[in-house]
Amino acid sequence: MSEYQGTFKRYEKKYLVTQQQYNALAKAFAARMVPDRFAESTISNIYYDTPDFRLIRRSLDRPAYKEKLRLRTYRTPGADTEAFVEIKKKYDHIVYKRRIAMTYSEAQAYLDGGAAPEQSQISREIDWFLHFYKGIQPAMCICYDRLALFDKYQPELRVTFDSGIRWRMDDLDLSSGSAGDHLLPHDTCLMEIKIPGTTPLWLARVLSENAIFPTHFSKYGAAYQTMLRESRSPQFGSETIHINEKGEIYCA
């Protein structure tokens, strides 16, 4: 396995960005934002949940504390591709992420009831999570194309752009590829700003000048809500997700 960061503690702010806004950001970022380790990649995730979707239902209520478990790869995996099993928690607006790396086949076996390839504090936390949430199982596949940047003058500041966000609930095996139904309009991407403290003044100014405002958006949550609407309305397949100027999602 390659070297990787296993723990994160930071604020994460999300923004839904149009193509025009993205172009303006690209110009503003050119002098100081550079690609990170993964640069451009297709990220594939399997989110785990209980049969009644207890985790995502609670998350959508926006409680003070919430958590989720996912399996992640940075390309369509083979058996020996590096994969990450991650617990992501949010408490009082701070995000805590803890993850362990292993091969994709090892991750599948582990999450199917096996033992972690190596024991650690993080693996014990994941073991507890799997034990606590009875019946937890693969629930949804979410994939997207990511551009990941960091500030060369303030390396702890990271900005990611996720486009082509797609989801599926069948064939929950990342080795099957990244196909799925698209979640957002084609000209909209999700930008996330990840930083240990407050947003730098220069970045806040860029966001303000381009009328880019934070929003509450969860890929898994939005896909789950879409799934519910589809299951309740046979006509939903012809509807389109729209986003207003505040970043709120509605269908029409």
Predicted regions mapped to residue ranges:
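Phosphate-end processing signature that detects enzymes handling 5′-triphosphorylated RNA
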Residues: 1-252
